[in-house]
Amino acid sequence: MSVVGIDLGFQSCYVAVARAGGIETIANEYSDRCTPACISFGPKNRSIGAAAKSQVISNAKNTVQGFKRFHGRAFSDPFVEAEKSNLAYDIVQLPTGLTGIKVKYMEEERNFTTEQVTAMLLSKLKETAESVLKKPVVDCVVSVPCFYTDAERRSVMDATQIAGLNCLRLMNETTAVALAYGIYKQDLPALEEKPRNVVFVDMGHSSYQVSVCAFNRGKLKVLATAFDTTLGGRKFDEVLVNHFCEEFGKKYKLDIKSKIRALLRLSQECEKLKKLMSANASDLPLSIECFMNDVDVSGTMNRGKFLEMCDDLLARVEPPLRSVLEQAKLRKEDIYAVEIVGGATRIPAVKEKISKFFGKELSTTLNADEAVTRGCALQCAILSPAFKVREFSITDVVPYSISLRWNSPAEEGSSDCEVFTKNHSAPFSKVLTFYRKEPFTLEAYYSSPQDLPYPDPAIAQFLVQKVTPQSDGSSSKVKVKVRVNVHGIFSVSSASLVEVLKFEENEEPMETDQNAKEEEKMQVDQEEPHAEEQQQQTPAENKAESEEMETSQAASKDKKMDQPPQAKKAKVKTSTVDLPIENQLLWQIDREMLNLYIENEGKMIMQDKLKKERNDAKNAVEEYVYEMRDKLSGEYEKFVSEDDRNSFTLKLEDTENWLYEDGEDQPKQVYVDKLAELKNLGQPIKMRFQESEERPKLFEELGKQIQQYMKVISSFKNKEDQYDHLDAADMLKVEKSTNEAMEWMNNKLNLQNKQSLTVDPVVKAKEIEAKIKELMSVCGPIISKPKPKVEPPKEEQKNAEQNGPVDGQGDSPGPQAAEQGTDTAVPSDSDKKLPEMDID
């Protein structure tokens, strides 16, 4: 089973796998561990990753990048509206209202959903992993920003399904970093000791995330998270782009923003300049040849001036740091270390701001680029039964408070309740109790829209169906289980109706006197049982933490509810009936459409494969033309007649011209047939050359074998001691085989020496190899027969002398022993061992 972690970044992606030796980040076909999050659409196929990145300028309108933040967002979303101006490609409103990406693919206009585009990238990463692992990749853990909402998370989950992946967990990026940090630490405090608090700062290309985590041995608990969803490396790039657009506009009278290709070129150069300034404080040049209208442009920038222009961005670094400490109720002195990851944390001013806030040196023990994917791979290994991993419990948090709202006819309106507070432990389940006579709807939403980086606070609506009153007409007790799962997605996972079957001793039904009051109320399980359980959990139990949280929470609630005071105990028999739930999720893709996307992705993968095979076949023809043309005037020259060489050379030239004219775009089979046609002419020449290279070596080896056996025959005839044990009849066989081999070799050598090199050889290398094997199989076993061993003479008296006294020493045997003689001697070894042989 494969164990894969995927860091799905805004600008670039990484894939890591768990192997016997640990976690390894995989390199792609370009030997680069970083794969650009980029897809380019062409008339025949798609290019994904590094191949697509090279087409960003040449195929700007059909090359898609920066699409990660469109997940689960409507076309009318303010964020999408703001992003439009930064995109070289077109985005459109889909029939569902979501954001679509418009490109020209296979010579026709196509609209793709964000899920489809992300699935294309995931398919490429999957292919990269499979090429290294040499086996199928299905199970994986994928990273998402910690600030993603339900709709965005479900959108990414749909993308993994379209790509044919089974996502075991959507893991928050900061949590993945914390896992990569903590699982290898050997000096963490014990479970009963005060935890070690570590802050993780992740500033990538598009966003800025901070989390504070508490570590104990074998345990990681996220305490709080904070973020700035738009502060990242690209904001610093934009500062440079805007500066040079203004400067070049004045200096060269160019309107750069009117030409998307010019703007893309400038953006690429500014990103390079930004990275250079991180390591160099002096003035650095920026030069672009033939930038616009055949005009060469140039400018300079230094770190000091750049930081002045970025003052407003740098001011946004501190608030999330302060927020995360306030949420976790920690002081700066409580922080053990501050670990930084992400490409933008390499900017010296950013590091300085973070270090100054905490008043301590920053820690850089993790790989800034690969920490997230390594954490995801570790989580996948923990979840996989195929790997034995050190026990490590992971408790994440709910980033936003979640509430439920339901209709309350008795109160002529609606009621609501906050079921998960901000920074509540996750994964987690709660059981809510309602009293209802008919089906009802629960509406889930985020309680604090002002904290949400998303325009719509709604999560979903859940219709609990088939709710009926009790047989006496009273309200039924309905237990509803709500859950935030390992992906951070909220759901009403189950609902059940408690049906009263029988009342004994003519007593009133339990809770009947309260039914009128509780008609439209609900009960929420308290969270204390979970907290107690967390303290009592052993590391072994922590591995199944999410399930234990849910089970114990529900069980403890039932225990409380079902154990009223003994004096008022009502003897009732009840049964539980599961109720169907109809989900109406925000921006959810329906199953039928998802299957269609899966089918389309399969077709596109096949089209890419066919295109690659066609290109490989075409390249093989071109490669063969160049190879044979060079060798015909080189090492193959004396193995082909002049007429044949001239005609073959002409054929090669015709093929080369055909490749760039009529044969430029042909089906794969045409190239395969063309290559076979050329090889029919070239293969005999190649064979003659190879035979001429191998034949002398093999004849030499055969001659050595014959010479060796002739020496043995001569030694045997001279009756040398070394071979005097060999049988004369066998040696006659050796002599006969050796003479025959010598005669065969001399005959073939004479014939071959008379043969021209431009025709096929008289004898081939494989025939000589067969003759060598034949000779060795006959002669080898005979001459290598070992001499028989000569047994040394036995010393018969030795044992007898050692059995009795030596030189008169030792006790004499008694009279009885003397009379018995050897019949009463000490039992022999075989006699001693005999009883043991009877024991099973």
Swiss-Prot record:
Q: Which residues carry this modification: Phosphothreonine?
A: T538
Q: Where is this region: Disordered?
A: 506-575, 782-840
Question: For the modification Phosphoserine, which residues carry it?
Answer: S76, S393, S415, S546, S647, S756
In terms of superkingdom, the source organism counts as Eukaryota
Q: What is its main location?
A: cytoplasm
List N6-methyllysine occurrences by residue. Answer: K773
Q: Name one GO cellular component term.
A: cytosol
Phosphotyrosine modifications at = Y89, Y336, Y660
Keywords assigned by UniProt?
Acetylation, ATP-binding, Cytoplasm, Methylation, Nucleotide-binding, Phosphoprotein, Stress response
PROSITE patterns per UniProt: HSP70_2, HSP70_3
Sample GO molecular function, one term: adenyl-nucleotide exchange factor activity
What GO biological process terms does the UniProt entry carry, in alphabetical order?
Answer: protein folding
SUPFAM superfamilies, per database record: Actin-like ATPase domain, Heat shock protein 70kD (HSP70), C-terminal subdomain, Heat shock protein 70kD (HSP70), peptide-binding domain
Residue ranges annotated as compositionally biased, kind Basic and acidic residues, are 514-533, 788-799, 829-840
Nucleotide-binding as UniProt keyword: yes
Compartment annotation: Cytoplasm
N6-acetyllysine occurs at which residues?
K53, K430, K679
Q: Which InterPro entries match?
A: ATPase_NBD, Heat_shock_70_CS, HSP70_C_sf, HSP70_peptide-bd_sf, Hsp_70_fam, HSPA4_NBD
Quaternary structure per UniProt? Interacts with TJP1/ZO-1.
Q: Which family does it belong to?
A: Belongs to the heat shock protein 70 family.
Question: What is the protein named?
Answer: Heat shock 70 kDa protein 4
In which organism is this protein found? Answer: Canis lupus familiaris (Dog)
| Designated gene of the protein | HSPA4
